Amino acid sequence: MPEITHRKNTRPVKVGDLTIGGSNELVIQSMTTTKTHDVEATVAEIKRLEEAGCQIVRVACPKEEDALAIAEIKKQINIPLVVDIHFDYKLALLAIEGGADKIRINPGNIGRREKVEEVVKACKAKGIPIRIGVNAGSLEKHILKKYGYPTADGMVESALHHIKILEDLDFHDIIVSMKASDVNLAIEAYTKAAQAFDYPLHLGITESGTLFAGTVKSAAGLGAIMSLGIGNTLRISLSADPVEEVKVARELLKSFGLASNAATLISCPTCGRIEIDLISIANEVEEYISTIKAPLKVAVLGCAVNGPGEAREADIGIAGARGEGLLFMKGKTVRKVPEETMVEELKMEIDKLAEEYFKKQEAEKLANAEK
């Protein structure tokens, strides 16, 4: 069996100010739900996604007016912009001219070779990569005829076909996705893709469903793929506010220790020993740390039985009891706090730890700059 190309051994590809692949972190992506030509609405949604932790955003581009809006959108956002093109190569050219950071296009679907050459030439001139988007639901007719139905081998064959078109034009800034709505098919397709080539892979389970069902399905599929060391960017596709996609993606990365810039909550399940409103407190703390870009582990425990000993890996936490709680760090009690103020005191300690982390990071940057 061919060896899987680990995410850290994939080709590095520049997307705006980010580098995808190589030794770089797995990056979170989402997609807007707005009409792209509505610049105000699109920018507003992208800024909400940015705030939630989205690192790359994709927009639809079915019409010329959408492509013409790219330049104005780019002026107002801070993260790389991917433009989704289907069939019409002229829209790709307009988007590239407008400042797109990446183009999502299947070169085999946009017509004659000279059209592909024009897109590739424009991407080369601007240093823009191309994402080849293979989808089990839209495989080429000849591949479906060969395999009878969507298969992992058929998806890899489709990817290699599109890759060869670009490679024949001496273009190698390529990212590939192998999306399917069937979890087992997606796992097999991504595994075989990682064995077939070393281009970075964008992960996704397409059409995964609503917020609850889609979260479970995406976590099951993408978690299995990520556990193999596969994947350089990911999108959680949900029938929900795209901000929820980003939240789920962040939690998934944290679960695998792949998010160095996010705080993590540890909280115990409820039981009859609990004498505080654990669920409300845990939700409040989770919301509070959701925008903290520091690798802190924060624990919220319902009683002294579970804490602080059982959460000794946490940087900071509280264990509740009737009328008071224990504030602890690294498994050791720091002090007792009144129940009515323990959440606020926990937040203050979280802020202190985050500030210490940021100062340390800044000092390290200065030290490295002086070398």
From Swiss-Prot:
User: Metal-binding: present as a keyword of the record?
Assistant: yes
Pathway(s)? Isoprenoid biosynthesis; isopentenyl diphosphate biosynthesis via DXP pathway; isopentenyl diphosphate from 1-deoxy-D-xylulose 5-phosphate: step 5/6
Please tell me where [4Fe-4S] cluster binds in this chain.
268, 271, 303, 310
Q: Which Pfam families match?
A: GcpE (PF04551)
Reactions the enzyme catalyzes: (2E)-4-hydroxy-3-methylbut-2-enyl diphosphate + oxidized [flavodoxin] + H2O + 2 H(+) = 2-C-methyl-D-erythritol 2,4-cyclic diphosphate + reduced [flavodoxin]
Can you provide one Gene Ontology molecular function annotated for this UniProt record?
iron ion binding
- Which InterPro entries does the annotation name? Dihydropteroate_synth-like_sf, IspG_bac, IspG_bac-typ, NO2/SO3_Rdtase_4Fe4S_sf
Which enzyme class?
oxidoreductase
* Cofactor(s) the protein needs: [4Fe-4S] cluster
Recite the UniProt cofactor note for this protein. Binds 1 [4Fe-4S] cluster.
Q: Which domain of life is it from?
A: Bacteria
Regions crossing the membrane: none
Give the EC number(s) under which this enzyme is classified: 1.17.7.3
UniProt record, GO biological process? isopentenyl diphosphate biosynthetic process, methylerythritol 4-phosphate pathway; terpenoid biosynthetic process
* Keyword vocabulary terms for this entry: 4Fe-4S, Iron, Iron-sulfur, Isoprene biosynthesis, Metal-binding, Oxidoreductase
Q: What does this protein do?
A: Converts 2C-methyl-D-erythritol 2,4-cyclodiphosphate (ME-2,4cPP) into 1-hydroxy-2-methyl-2-(E)-butenyl 4-diphosphate.
The entry's family comment says:
Belongs to the IspG family.
Q: What is this protein called?
A: 4-hydroxy-3-methylbut-2-en-1-yl diphosphate synthase (flavodoxin)
Q: Which organism is it from?
A: Macrococcus caseolyticus (strain JCSC5402)
Recall the taxonomic lineage recorded for the source organism: Bacteria, Bacillati, Bacillota, Bacilli, Bacillales
Gene that produces this protein:
ispG
